[in-house]
């Protein structure tokens, strides 16, 4: 995560802070619903540690847990559960009470992956194009109903709605044929194209709405092909990605050797991959900014906004924008969404960048 400031240029206003986070997802996003919970899962999550919405909430300054508290304090705002398909969510939204702070809250809606998992139960092994297209269209209709209900009846104005991932890339479907994987991947691509069109329609027809669309489809592709760039390991067996539970590891402890894997079980990411999902989303909705620069005697004061809490940062700089190496001018602990840092002023002109390297610590 990187923010830029060119010395002497205009500074930027900070985005208004959100007041709450409400989540409507499937098993990947749940913090309270794991029918297989036990020693190999972190509380009632379907992973070995915190899930992405918890990390995002922390980065947004909306609450975080200590390591000793396995129960997320904001779980009452999390309406996610395993196998919550979009049709279920249409009904569940009706039972969701309108929040008093709806206009300033963030709403996460991510159930399109669940729809494809459901299709693998209801449609697969058929590759009838009409059947799959009808399923996609029904999911899109459901998502439109979800958006409009949240907007009109619940007062939501800011939504996070990620693209669907290629579910054939998860270990659950390692054994299906390459031809079938290609067919289903194309159906996901078709859905995502129509999904983006749907979100654009909502943006143009619902005044004041903002919808962020994290591209988790491309992210999963990139993580699988270059896991090391994200601090992860793509564990393989016979050329297929495997999860911690089905791998050759004998130590399945929550903070053990499997923490660097991409998948914790056959469907769900590890907590470390969850943190990557959160980082990508945080950059999209609240890009870190330098909002003001004050020249002092011997130093420059940089005021920062949208600092991702829990992800420590660096101020790096150089005297020529195009030439030379970036050097570290200061380090800081990200403890608040708005912070100030002082850097030495050792020349007539400096160009600064904010850098937040990918990092993760259990849980």
Task: Describe each PLM feature range.
Residues 286-363:
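Short, composition-biased motifs enriched in small/polar/acidic residues
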Residues 1-289:
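Conserved active-site regions of diverse hydrolases
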